[in-house]
Amino acid sequence: MCIRDRAIALGHDLGHTPFGHAGERALNNVCPCGFKHNEQSVRVVEVLEKQGEGLNLTWEVIDGIRNHKSAGMPATLEGQIVRLSDKIAYVNHDIDDAVRAGIMNEEELPKELRKVLGNSKRERLNTLTHDVIVNSMDKPKICMSEEVREALMELRAYMFTHVYENPLAKGEEDKAIRMVEDLYSYYETHMEKLSLIHISEPTRLALIS
């Protein structure tokens, strides 16, 4: 694997919150300037790591981390690989989680989607990965075929309707949001309670600024 691919993949979610996207939405609600985990990931590697000195990463890696989840497209092929890999990975992980939680069965996925993508996680990952490789060969960008891209988008839409908005999942998400918002409110007025005693002064200032 290319070193840049690996660096972007390892760094792209360093700024994520507890409870994933639910925690991200909670912080975005309460932070005066909003909160996006991809921007926080950049802050981690540029400011917070190495006692406030950052990791001295290349601009290509920083760009890939920042744009793996935003309106902008990564400037490099490596960044585009990670961005697309992230989409492929999390929708399949979410299916696994939903099955384990008893929210759905894989057999309930629409037949037309299973026909294109496959009937199991292994088949879906194989289809999606192979499609990206074949359709990106000798091209200046990383992409999928129209058929598979649309099937992936429809799968994500199905997950939003039947899983993410499911009353059970929604109830757990609401609890997570309240927890993060309550913690933020508490520490905002009790900064002395933050465990910063073993953190260097540059890092401490970066954390509270």
Question: Which residues does each PLM region occupy?
Answer:
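Histidine-centered, transition-metal-coordinating active-site segments
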Residues: 35-196, 200
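Single conserved hydrophobic/aromatic residue that forms the stacking wall/gate
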Residues: 1-3, 197-209
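Residue-level recognition of specific faces of alpha-helices
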Residues: 7-10, 64, 87, 207
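Short, function-defining helix-loop hinge/capping sites that tune catalysis or transport
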Residues: 20-21, 94, 102, 209
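An N-terminal structural lobe/cap that precedes and organizes the functional/catalytic core
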Residues: 4-51
